[in-house]
Amino acid sequence: MGWHDTSEPLTTKAIEDGHWTFVSQQIKTVAKKPVAQGYRNTDPRVMEQNLQDGKMDVVAGLRYSIADPALPRKVMEDRTCDMRLCIVCCRCLDDVVSQGKPLNYCGVNPRLGEELDHEAFPQASKRKKVMVVGSGPAGINAALTAAQRGHAVDLYEEGPRLGGCVKMSSIFSPYHERYLDYLLTQVKQHPQITVHLKTKVTPETVRQAKPDAAIVAVGGKPLGLDVPGADGKNVVSSHDFLEMINGHKPAGKRGAFNSFMWGAGSLFLSMYYTPSFARTMTEKSPWPISRNVAIIGGGLPGCEFGHLCMETGRTTAIIEERKKVGFDVGGSDRFGLISSFKQAENVEMYPLTRVTAITEEGVRAVQTTPEGDMELFIPAKTVAITLGLAENHDLGEACKPLVDEVYLVGDCETPGRIADATKMGYRAACAL
């Protein structure tokens, strides 16, 4: 069957749930003992159907139980909304197999690796009024953990709905969408959490709220590009899309038509957004992503966006200053992702390439080759900047003179992945 570095990867999200049951089904035709099947099982509905269809006798697996050790009990009790399902981020595999690290991080289970250190939700010795600012995975996990420990939690979100960056990553991954649904359900069910939507938190907001503790999870600052044309009307960024999903028209959008469309799109999505709808619109609409795209930034965000562009038939160029496109993609996913780019007729990768200017016709750049630097012009109707995030300590520092306990978590403290944010939110709430 191979491993991650084969033409068909074994356990990544590129493989559908239950895909490998055809192997166990064939083994059952000759086996005299019960057959267990253990790869790519994350959805209990698929597992149950495969058992009923006789494709296996026993569901084996690890990642679904890493994500939620109580999953079998929840299945028996039909607690569908409380199932914390694996998002197939492969962080567990990357840490243990690729890097030889302990099994301490999971994209959705903040307690992983700390089971013997303390109770899951140690009861607080003193009930506190806790202000959580930001509702991404760090903020929501902090809010849920603090509430479980007995604190009174106020969860603030500047946009019209909870979810933070997961609202956008859900467009690329249905697995993230179901995790977002889980988080929203848990917040809604908890009586100790009061949600404040469409509320921008400032130092004055904190002063008036008078919390005993503040957990700041407002996300990082998007990294920009300082070259001529970076503010052109054909330029978009991942932050622009997050702003639009939050119902805010991104700043600096030039051109009457362009400005109108961003404003109208922001207004519409503030009322009717769902990840599935946004995914469909991204696939079919020529705006704001045209059929010819240059992506500046070949890290994980750029690669995921590039994969979406590739699958939707867009001519796609991925430009990266480092030696390799996908330099920070996990070991489990990297080979299959880069192989799909190499095999696609509509994708070109430009490593060791520095952008010098952006025009309405495309991107000017300089690529380092063994023969020396070579000037390039990469045609594109849309230029997407996906350079990642920088830390964002402004609000956290402003809160310190106002609140006895202040914790910065998630990308605003240290930009990272969903597993890092999940763990940081949990640990901060346990420290209250």
Question: What is each of the regions a protein language model found here?
Answer:
Residues 68, 73-74, 306-314, 318-319, ...:
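Internal hydrophobic alpha-helix adjacent to the cofactor/substrate pocket in enzyme cavities
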Residues 301-308, 329-330, 400, 409-432:
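A conserved FAD-binding loop/helix module that cradles the flavin
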Residues 1-133, 137, 141-153, 161, ...:
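Flavin-dependent oxidoreductase catalytic cores
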Residues 34, 129, 152-154, 292, ...:
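Residues at the starts of beta-strands that form the adenosine-phosphate
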Residues 177-224, 232, 240, 256-259, ...:
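A Rossmann-like FAD-binding core segment of flavoenzymes
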Residues 151-164, 314-326:
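Glycine-rich FAD pyrophosphate-binding loop
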Residues 126-136, 286-299:
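Beta1/beta-strand and adjacent pyrophosphate-binding region of the FAD-binding site
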Residues 69, 96, 116, 223-225, ...:
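Glycine/Thr-rich phosphate-binding loops of Rossmann-like dinucleotide-binding domains
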